[in-house]
Amino acid sequence: MVIILLLLLLSFLDPSLEESLAPRLTRTPRAPCARGQACDPRQRRDAGGRGGVYEHLGGAPRRRKLYCATKYHLQIHPNGKIDGSLEENNPLSILEITAVDVGVVAIKGLFSGRYLAMNEKGRLYASEVFNRECEFLERIHELGYNTYASRHHATTQPPPTGSGIGGSKRRASSKRQWYVSINGKGRPRRGFKTRSTDKASLFLPRVLANKDHEMVRKLRESQRHHTGSHRAPVGRAERRRRRHRGSKGHNRRADI
């Protein structure tokens, strides 16, 4: 009798034990790793930059104004000029900052349509198209400001030589970054003359004010109106051609 009771108890306990142990025993299947690539169990981001460990890449651009510690707003002109402005609501100072790689951003003027760039001589200019000179390393400074250094242009310092046990040992050469900088007169400084600790190289990303958002809204409306005005004549011409074809066909049928 006791044995029968034990068997009945075990039969009642078995389903509950299986249900409690099922989540522990089942494992999430991992995606197969490609040959020659390191296996990463974390989710990878897709082509649009959504999901995964690189979720912050490839998203919508941040609309900001870069306020320099010298009290100037960085602005990008349509003619390719770069300088600073003391005006609070200057449309040329409204920028779009987009991440293009880990810690690398592209800065575009919303109203000028040009990209901030630095050439091999350390001069800032506004490029019509995005190129490698438009890539900047974005770093957060200890004072709360951001610095923006050219990704591809820097000063290569000669490696110092030191005496060792087996003779002289050469150290690896170091590079000094070239930073985006606006001096106290609102003019850009050459990259090789800048330092990360310079006041002119520190920028505070500011969110847009209500007046800035209003200017952006008007810009979008004017762009839509401009696009629609170009499409309208094409539509009217097409309608005229269709009416002309229809009238020709009607006249031919009448002659027959």
UniProtKB/Swiss-Prot annotation:
Gene3D superfamilies: 2.80.10.50. It is found in: Secreted. Residues 238-256 have a biased composition (Basic residues). It comes from the Eukaryota. Residues 1-18 form the signal peptide. InterPro entries: Fibroblast_GF_fam, IL1/FGF. Disulfide bonds: none annotated. Pfam families: FGF. Transmembrane segments: none annotated. GO terms for biological process: adenohypophysis development; anterior/posterior pattern specification; cartilage development; cell fate specification; cell population proliferation; dorsal/ventral pattern formation; ectodermal placode development; embryonic neurocranium morphogenesis. SUPFAM superfamilies: Cytokine. GO terms for molecular function: fibroblast growth factor receptor binding; growth factor activity. Keywords: Developmental protein, Differentiation, Growth factor, Mitogen, Secreted, Signal. GO terms for cellular component: cytoplasm; extracellular matrix; extracellular space. Residues 31-54, 151-176, 219-256 are annotated as: Disordered. Belongs to the heparin-binding growth factors family. Plays an important role in the regulation of embryonic development, cell proliferation, and cell differentiation. This is Fibroblast growth factor 3.
